[in-house]
Every structure is written in structure tokens, then in C-alpha cells.
From Swiss-Prot:
Residues 1-80 form the GST N-terminal domain. Transmembrane segments: none annotated. The keyword Transferase applies. Its EC number is 2.5.1.18. This is Glutathione S-transferase 1, isoform B. InterPro entries: Glutathione-S-Trfase_C-like, Glutathione-S-Trfase_C_sf, Glutathione_S-Trfase_N, Thioredoxin-like_sf. It comes from Anopheles gambiae. Keywords: Transferase. The keyword Nucleus does not apply. GO terms for biological process: glutathione metabolic process. Glutathione binds at residues 9, 50-52, 64-66. GO terms for cellular component: extracellular region. Residues 89-210 form the GST C-terminal domain.
Length: 216
């Protein structure tokens, strides 16, 4: 199973941890966006959106990290861990989906809105966008009130994996989220629970140079 990825990318790391959780071995294909490797004809044939992560499973190509994560669990997950990772109960699954969409459309989006213009465009820091990150973290802190996992329940889910990858990027970027006590408690507990969290951390370090000159 081929996995086209960039180490510093939180979505790529989330897929990598999901694969480890369901026991799938990935054939890693490092894709350097700075060198335009994602624009090569052979890659565009797989993924016309030319983005990573991209998974190719026996000729079946799929991109968007959360879609890939769900696919891996539904196809390769074992009954013993499936119901925690991506529950079959409609309401429990809906909560996991909601948290995944929260990560994609709110937390990770707001992180990108603040940091990426500074990194890639040399734009000045936007304090309004910075404040919106704090608001998103406050939402996550509320989700975790009285809960061990972001979607509740007795085991980590795909939502925990995705958000853990995102928060690892926050830490590497130098963003201090220690004021969000529930988030901090949860974040510190994840490395002992999520498989390949050590790889998540080491891969995330690849992004550190991009954040060195960004205002926090």
C-alpha cells in the first residue's frame, strides 16, 4: 500500500498513526512539495488535486486524511478495536465525525490561517486570527471536560488521532496551550495510547524550521 506523504504535515501523520492502529504497513513515498514532486504527471494521474496525504491501495487512490483514516479502519480494522476507533453506533460515530470536522474546519484551519501566511507569504502576524486559535482551543477544552477522549467513550478514536497530530504541530510551532487544562491533560496522555506516536513526534520536527521566525 503506497503512501505519499510529507513528514511535517499533521494530516499525513494522522494517517500514519491510523495505519499503525489497524496493523497496516505503509510503503512510504516521501513527496517533496517544495520540489514540485506532487505536480509530476504520474502523481497527477493518481490525484488530480495534487495534495498529500495520498494513499494507493491495490490501484485504488484516495486523498484527504480523514477519508483515508476512515477507509483504513473500515477495511482493515479488527473488531476488537474498530468500535473505539470508528464506532458502528450511529450516534457515537456522528460524534467522532463531528470532532474530525472540527479539527479540519476549525482548529487546524485557524492554525493555518494564522501561521501559513507568515511562513509562505511573509505576511505580518494577524492578531485577530491568533485570537481565533484560542477560541478553537477553548471549544476543544470544553469537549474534554470530564472526558478522557475527545469523542467520549472508553478508548481513543480517529478523532483523537487526528487532533493529536494537529496539537503536535502546535507544540512544534511553539504555541503554548497549557492554559487549556483539559487539552493539556489529554495531549500528555496520548503518546502512551496511540501507536506510532513516536514517529508522529519525529516527523513533526521536520516542520520546526518553518516556525522559527513566526510571531507567537
Amino acid at each position: 500500500m503506497d503512501f505519499y506523504y510529507l513528514p511535517g504535515s499533521a494530516p499525513c501523520r494522522a494517517v500514519q498513526m491510523t495505519a499503525a492502529a489497524v496493523g497496516v504497513e505503509l510503503n512510504l513515498k516521501l513527496t517533496d512539495l517544495m520540489k514540485g514532486e506532487h505536480m509530476k504527471p504520474e502523481f497527477l494521474k493518481l490525484n488530480p488535486q495534487h495534495c498529500v496525504p495520498t494513499l494507493v491501495d491495490n490501484g485504488f487512490a484516495l486523498w484527504e486524511s480523514r477519508a483515508i483514516m476512515c477507509y483504513l479502519v473500515e477495511k482493515y480494522g479488527k473488531p476488537c478495536n474498530n468500535d473505539s476507533l470508528y464506532p458502528t453506533d450511529p450516534q457515537k460515530r456522528a460524534i467522532v465525525n463531528q470532532r474530525l470536522y472540527f479539527d479540519m474546519g476549525t482548529l487546524y484551519q485557524r492554525f493555518g490561517d494564522y501561521y501559513y501566511p507568515q511562513i509562505f507569504e511573509g505576511a505580518p502576524a494577524n492578531e485577530t486570527n491568533f485570537a481565533k486559535i484560542g477560541e478553537a482551543l477553548a471549544f476543544l477544552d470544553t469537549f474534554l471536560e470530564g472526558e478522557r477522549f475527545v469523542a467520549g467513550g472508553n478508548g481513543y478514536s480517529l478523532a483523537d488521532i487526528s487532533l493529536y497530530a494537529t496539537l503536535t504541530t502546535f507544540e512544534v510551532a511553539g504555541y503554548d496551550f497549557s492554559a487549556y487544562v483539559n487539552v493539556l491533560r489529554w495531549y500528555k496522555s496520548m503518546p502512551e495510547l496511540i501507536p506510532a506516536s513516536d514517529t508522529n513526534r519525529s516527523w513533526a520536527e521536520a516542520a520546526r524550521p518553518f516556525f522559527d521566525k513566526v510571531k507567537h
